């Protein structure tokens, strides 16, 4: 079968379903594909196709994730759904599936449950910026007052974790009823609710800023000298763009920030007018000595990112089966933290009342590195011991 060409006509947004086990995340995902398929915007994907999601390995961590795609009139969406709670935790911490917004599914019959809370907390911690709520299984609730009560509870919970609980769109419906009906019409009592949800997602979750529009950043992978021309750093542009004549800062591994000017940009030995996010390039730097730059530093737009040593993080600790530790670790644990292209030693401070961390746990912690690294909220990292990955984390707040 010939592959369809991906037409880049609509803005692209990444979303995902989150919420407590058995509240209907996967059924809703299926219902969205069925309803949108009626308007030619999706391939209908059945529950069991989504539920038996293949396991993927992201940085050595096994995560089961289902990916579906669909289109509304306004946008193209990539949607992730995970079968198990542990998969969500790993997914959100590793950033394996970046979400520009999440659809929180809450069963109207049960109200918010422990994983509802945990997923909202994780969304807040790892920087999922927007949430839209689908209050599911309303066919099982006869009392409209009960429905109002659940909605209020959900709004309060969202507010508790610093989401705008009063503004967040909440759509009520039944994913199962929409699936059973299958007409996919907007006028339909059940299918119409799925359309209402997609309208809310379309309007409430903004189109994310493209990587090329963000401030320039390139992690340095290699450094060499070209006789008579100067020092060249190579790497893949993570975001933004860079051209000859741009002023950049060299940040990380030293306390001071070094300013320089890009005097040449090359890609595959060819001279480039401008390099953009995703390009693997070499940059010639004015007046910089080979000894002043090393792998693990970054080139960045002046003022856009700072070197730090101390930060808070949300961390997932690999299980023994995933190749992680076989034993717990304690306060003062000193592994390597792998940021972008290099390892830096750091010390772990556990929250008060936490004695130890077991393989398979996810935990908030404070980390202090022995040398500064260019760090910002949302940056992902790996925790390593002797070259093997034992954990994955995301920076949730800078301390110093």
From Swiss-Prot:
It is an enzyme of class 3 (hydrolase). The keyword Nucleotidyltransferase does not apply. Its EC number is 3.6.5.3. Residues 81-84 are annotated as: G3. Residues 10-209 form the tr-type G domain. Mg(2+) binds at residue 26. The keyword Metal-binding applies. Coiled coil: none annotated. It is found in: Cytoplasm. It catalyses: GTP + H2O = GDP + phosphate + H(+). Keywords: Cytoplasm, Elongation factor, GTP-binding, Hydrolase, Magnesium, Metal-binding, Nucleotide-binding, Protein biosynthesis. Residues 19-26 are annotated as: G1. Its main location: cytoplasm. GTP binds at residues 19-26, 81-85, 136-139. Residues 174-176 are annotated as: G5. Residues 60-64 are annotated as: G2. Pfam families: GTP_EFTU, GTP_EFTU_D2, GTP_EFTU_D3. GO terms for cellular component: cytosol. GO terms for molecular function: GTP binding; GTPase activity; translation elongation factor activity. Transmembrane segments: none annotated. Monomer. Belongs to the TRAFAC class translation factor GTPase superfamily. Classic translation factor GTPase family. EF-Tu/EF-1A subfamily. GTP hydrolase that promotes the GTP-dependent binding of aminoacyl-tRNA to the A-site of ribosomes during protein biosynthesis. This is Elongation factor Tu. It comes from Moorella thermoacetica (strain ATCC 39073 / JCM 9320).
């Amino acid at each position: 079968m010939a592959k369809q060409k991906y037409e880049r006509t609509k803005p692209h947004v990444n979303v995902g379903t989150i919420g407590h086990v058995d509240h209907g995340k996967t059924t809703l995902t299926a219902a969205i594909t069925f309803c949108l398929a009626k308007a030619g915007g999706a391939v209908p994907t059945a529950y069991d196709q989504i539920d038996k999601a293949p396991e993927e390995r992201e940085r050595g961590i096994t995560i089961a994730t289902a990916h579906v795609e669909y289109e509304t009139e306004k946008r193209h969406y990539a949607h992730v759904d995970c079968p198990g709670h542990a998969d969500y935790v790993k997914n959100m911490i590793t950033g394996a599936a970046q979400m520009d917004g999440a659809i929180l599914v809450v069963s109207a019959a049960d109200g918010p449950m422990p994983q509802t809370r945990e997923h909202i907390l994780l969304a807040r911690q790892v920087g999922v910026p927007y949430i839209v709520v689908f209050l599911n299984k309303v066919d099982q609730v006869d009392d409209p007052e009960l429905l109002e009560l659940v909605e209020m509870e959900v709004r309060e919970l969202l507010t508790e974790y610093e989401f705008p609980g009063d503004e967040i769109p909440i759509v009520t419906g039944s994913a199962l009823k929409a699936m059973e009906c299958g007409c996919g019409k907007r006028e339909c009592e059940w299918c119409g609710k799925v359309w209402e949800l997609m309208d809310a997602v379309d309007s409430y979750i903004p189109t994310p800023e493209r990587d090329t529009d963000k401030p320039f950043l390139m992690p340095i992978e290699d450094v060499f000298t070209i006789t008579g021309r100067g020092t060249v750093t190579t790497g893949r542009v993570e975001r933004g763009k860079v051209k000859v004549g741009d002023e950049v800062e060299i940040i990380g591994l030293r306390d001071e920030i070094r300013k320089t000017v890009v005097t040449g940009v090359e890609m595959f030995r060819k001279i480039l007018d401008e390099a953009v996010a995703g390009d693997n390039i070499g940059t010639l730097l004015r007046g910089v000595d080979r000894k002043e730059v090393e792998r693990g530093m970054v080139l960045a737009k002046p003022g856009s990112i700072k070197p730090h040593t101390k930060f808070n993080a949300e961390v997932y600790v690999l299980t023994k089966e995933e190749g992680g530790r076989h034993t717990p670790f304690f306060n003062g644990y000193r592994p390597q933290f792998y940021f972008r292209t290099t390892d830096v030693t750091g010390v772990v401070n556990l929250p008060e009342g936490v004695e130890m961390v077991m393989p398979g746990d996810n935990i908030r912690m404070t980390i202090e590195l022995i040398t500064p690294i260019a760090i910002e909220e949302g940056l992902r990292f790996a925790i390593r011991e002797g070259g093997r990955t034992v954990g994955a984390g995301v920076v949730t707040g800078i301390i110093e």
